[in-house]
């Protein structure tokens, strides 16, 4: 019924907000534990040779990895995922070096607020 539709909508809005939050946080050079550690000297040299920025560290080279982050929701849950298996593997490697894929405490509070506010509109 309407509660199920409202729950799906609330989960969808929360998931969409978290997708943007991860992308914005990463673009600012921040992971789950604060500021990313710097690139290695060799990688800085490589990035410079390709005309890429070297600071802040933001996991952005071609843009494909972050662009492949999407979300889906149903009446029971929402999830964020990578639409490309190659980009998912790349994300796992970057996450191992500089944890970024997940939800910070602050982001969790935002998700809770969005979900509750959306659900309260119909209850």
Show which residues each predicted segment covers:
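Short, Lys/Arg-rich flexible segments
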Residues: 1-123
């Amino acid at each position: 019924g309407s509660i199920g539709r409202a729950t799906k909508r609330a989960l969808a809005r929360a998931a969409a907000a978290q997708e943007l939050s991860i992308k914005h946080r990463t673009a600012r050079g921040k992971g789950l534990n604060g500021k990313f550690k710097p690139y290695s000297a060799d990688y800085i040299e490589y990035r410079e040779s390709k005309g890429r920025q070297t600071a802040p560290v933001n996991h952005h080279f071609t843009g494909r990895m972050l662009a492949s982050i999407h979300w889906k929701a149903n009446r029971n849950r929402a999830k964020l995922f990578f639409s490309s298996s190659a980009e998912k593997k790349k994300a796992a490697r970057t996450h191992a070096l500089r944890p970024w894929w997940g939800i910070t405490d602050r982001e969790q509070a935002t998700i809770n607020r969005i979900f509750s506010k959306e659900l309260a509109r119909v209850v």
